[in-house]
Structures are given as structure tokens and as C-alpha cells.
Amino acid sequence: MKNISILGATGSIGTQTLDVIRNDSEAFKLLAVSAHSNFKKMIEIIDEFKPELVVMVDKLAYNKVLDYCCEKKLKTSVKVGYEAFNEVASYKDSNIVVTSIVGMIGLIPTLEAIKAGKDIALANKETLVVAGELVTKEAKKYGVNILPVDSEHGAIFQCLQGNKYKDINKILLTASGGPFRGKSFDELNNVTLNDALNHPKWTMGRKITIDSATLMNKGLEVIEAHWLFNVDYEKIQVLVHPQSIVHSMVQYKDGSVIAQLGPTDMRLPIQYALNYPVRKERIVEPVDFYSTPDLHFEKPDMDTFRCLRLAYDAGMAGGIMPAILNSANEYAVDLFLKDKIKFTNIQEIIEDALNHFENVNNLTANTIINKSNEVTKYLKGKIGF
């Protein structure tokens, strides 16, 4: 039996991880969980899975959960605040930590989990984006596996099984194209928040859905793939694949291409990561090739969707630039979600931040966090909110 901890248990990935655990309760035990403020869902998790440790960020939510556990006379330990995430990440008897919180807030808990010798089921792509070199070095030092949870990197990981990384000619990273595929920049000027949140294929959290609409999500995944698979950026190619059936491919030096195909259901890569290296019975219905539409692939429009180009540029520059990219994106997307800026302002804000700050190398976690805070402060001062 594997003991599981989940950072971000009430969000989209966390909820689907719980479904995987629920589906194979003899293989998994949930020991520790965290969430921000959804105390109702957390109480449901406590009732069903009986975790030993629960952390809530929001003080009101913490009090609600604590009162419930006291009322039911449960032995569950309930703690409050982001600092307590580290306790979930390094919980003594856990074997694997699912990092499904959004944003670079996941960096420190991920490093703590690695230092505690826990394998990482990584759904928090920002951790590798902002600190890929640091995280991969620490994982190697402590003998920890970093297992990709998102569909594209999970697909690449499966395509690499039984092969050697040195034989990779190219990673073909697929993208649905998002809700605005084919639109011009002028058309993007008029899109609404609801338009951007209407993803054609995937049901996800709000922030990642906007990232998918700008193609920044794919840009972040390019940087993540660079660190996960030790592949140069020149060998990572994005293909727009609107059917979202091929989740990614690997082309080898002999010209052969291995692809992973499946339904648009995140439980599939989650199940593979949690059970690795064992492949379990299916939890989702497989692709029906008789009813599958034709598969199409096209080049991404990086002139209209500049976020993807900015991500490539930041990744190839290295150093602190990916962290600047990420912080500016988090700030801009938050403003868009609050209806304070236009959709096209997102990439303009990111480009401004990348041009403003100089590169820095030899990064520590503190350097990354401090610079990210500087980016937010700079943008707030310039934009006014």
C-alpha cells in the first residue's frame, strides 16, 4: 500500500486524485491533505478518507474544520497557514506527495517533500518553471522520483519507457489550441472572461484555463519538459491538436514516433503516476477509434499568441527569467480574472516585465521568491492595482 499526501486536495487535480484513490482503496491510503478555504469539501474528505493531518490556509475555514473534528472527536490534526504545507509535504509515513496547488507557492513544499525523501507526483508545473535546475538537483541528491501528472508530460513519460533519453530527436508537445484557436489579435481584443473560461476540451481550474487560452500553459509546459526530460528547447516542438486525443509524442533518432493517446480525463495520468511503475486496470473508458474524429495537427500561431514565444525565450535565457515570466503571468491572469484588464493585456504585461528585469544566475529558493515579489511590486506600481 502507498501512503499519499495531497497539497491542494479540494481543487480540480486534488479532487480527481481522490477519485483515483477511492477507486483503488486497497492500494492507497490518504494520510495528509491541504486546501485553501473550501472547508465543506475538506470535511467530506475527512469523513471519507480519515487523513491524519489537515491544513487549511484560511483561518475561518481552519476554525470550521477544527470545530468539526472536535465535535466528532476525531484524532485528525488540524493546522492553519501556508507554513503548515511543509508538514503535509514531509509527513512522516507518506510515500508520495501530489503537488496540485496552483502557482509558485508550491515551490517550498515541493523542496521540503524532496528533502524528506518523498516521491513527487507533480501537477504544480510552476515549481519546475521557476526552479527547474534547483528542484531536479535536489531530487537527484535525495534519490526522489519526479512523476509528471499533467496529461502531456505524463504522455511523454510513458512514451519514454524502455527507451533512452539520449536517443530522443524531438519531443512533440500537443496543445488543443484553446478556445481562441484561429482568431486574430484584433479579435482577441474583444473576448470576454467567460469566453476565455470556456475551454473546448478540458475542465480545469480558472487560472490554468486562462493560461490555456493564452497558450502560456503550453509555454510553461515547454519549460517543464526541458527539466523533466533533460531535452534542449530546440528539440521541444509544440503541435496544435484540436481533438486532444494524442496527448504528446516522442520522435527518436531513427525517425520513429511513439505517441500516447487517450480520453481527456486527468485521472488517467494521475493513476499512472501514483501506481508507477505498475500499470493498473483502467479507471476511464478508452478511446473508441471507430467514433474518433480525424486527427489534425498544425503549427501554433506565436505571433498572435505571444505568450508561447515569450516562454520559449525565457526558458532559453535561463536563470531568473522563467521566474519573472511566471510571476508576471500570475499577476496578469489574476487581473484578467477580476475583469481589470483585457485578454490581450496579459501578454503585454509579461513582455514588459521580461524587458524590465536583468537576468540572474546561481539561484536559490530565496532568490527566486524575492525576485518574484519584486516583479509583482513593479507591475503593481506601473499598472496601479
Curated annotation (Swiss-Prot):
Positions contributing to Mn(2+) binding: D150, E152, E221
Pfam families reported for this sequence: DXP_redisom_C (PF08436), DXP_reductoisom (PF02670), DXPR_C (PF13288)
A GO term for molecular function: NADPH binding
Top class in the EC scheme: oxidoreductase
InterPro entries referenced in this protein's UniProt entry, alphabetically: DXP_reductoisomerase, DXP_reductoisomerase_C, DXP_reductoisomerase_N, DXPR_C, DXPR_C_sf, NAD(P)-bd_dom_sf
Swiss-Prot/TrEMBL catalytic activity: 2-C-methyl-D-erythritol 4-phosphate + NADP(+) = 1-deoxy-D-xylulose 5-phosphate + NADPH + H(+)
Lineage: superkingdom: Bacteria
Keywords of the record: Isoprene biosynthesis, Manganese, Metal-binding, NADP, Oxidoreductase
Keyword Ion transport recorded: no
Binding residues annotated for 1-deoxy-D-xylulose 5-phosphate, in chain numbering: K125, S151, E152, S176, H199, S212, N217, K218, E221
EC number: 1.1.1.267
Pathway(s) the chain acts in: Isoprenoid biosynthesis; isopentenyl diphosphate biosynthesis via DXP pathway; isopentenyl diphosphate from 1-deoxy-D-xylulose 5-phosphate: step 1/6
GO BP annotation list: isopentenyl diphosphate biosynthetic process, methylerythritol 4-phosphate pathway involved in terpenoid biosynthetic process
Required co-factors: Mg(2+); Mn(2+)
Residues engaged in binding NADPH: T10, G11, S12, I13, N38, N124, E126, G205
Role description: Catalyzes the NADPH-dependent rearrangement and reduction of 1-deoxy-D-xylulose-5-phosphate (DXP) to 2-C-methyl-D-erythritol 4-phosphate (MEP).
Similarity annotation: Belongs to the DXR family.
NCBIfam families hit by this protein: Dxr, PRK12464.1
HAMAP family in the record: DXP_reductoisom
Stated name of the protein: 1-deoxy-D-xylulose 5-phosphate reductoisomerase
Species of the source: Clostridium acetobutylicum (strain ATCC 824 / DSM 792 / JCM 1419 / IAM 19013 / LMG 5710 / NBRC 13948 / NRRL B-527 / VKM B-1787 / 2291 / W)
Gene behind the chain: dxr
